[in-house]
Amino acid sequence: MEAICGVSFLGNCARSGTVILEELGAEHLRTGKPILYTSADSVIQIAAHESIVPLEQLYEICRRLRGLADRERIGRVIARPFLGEPGAFRRTANRHDFAMRPPETVLNRLEAAGVETIGVGKIGDIFSGSGLSQSLPTKSNAEGCATMDRLLAENPDRPRLLFTNLVDFDMLYGHRRDPAGYARALVEFDDWFGSRLPGLDSETLLLITADHGNDPTWRGTDHTREQVPLLMKGPGMPRNLGARESFADVAATVAEWFGIDSRGAAGLAGLAGKSFLA
């Protein structure tokens, strides 16, 4: 990895992102060497202080590692910039994920069918841009909600999917085990969401869920295992959607709503979820 990137790394171990800054942040400031680490997820993470390694240089290091990560089937290479001094380091909102390009997804089928697919927040990073007509990165829940407000106020000339990720719950409050901050963020989102809900018409399908848990009251700093919420506003509501067998059910529901085939090409059985609309 050092040969590919042309730099020497610190770390090269499995650690929590916050812990490794405590352990190696001061040495990074002294040597200028980026910190390389991994975690329980399928990731390579590169941390660097923004005053030591400029953002574009950090991103370029991650781009170079993406080829190696593809070969080893590693899901993401994550740039983890931070600021601050020893004892008070803080990760910034300039994180950037370089993900493995996924196989065909419902997003690709929507785009091919003429549906405008817009990713807000980390969605462009997660899907490596695949199947997205437009990617709108954001740095906070507030910016994500403001972007949604702007998009919902528009009158598009074709069907549109808005796919938004609100990162603060996970990044700022889950991993950092800040239950008070998590609660405030939930209240803020609930206020925003509640005021927008009456404005959604019968031609709009709304789905809210999460890709994993991150209990801010649990020990450690990693993701936690619990059932995630699944809320829908659309035809046949209200009713209990029950506990689903697969995230693919969300994709199947979106595919049915837009009138496309969710099954994909031959052999992609992973797309064959069960629509909530059925």
Where are these regions (language model features)?
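Feature captures the catalytic ectodomains and active-site-proximal regions of enzymes
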Residues: 1-278
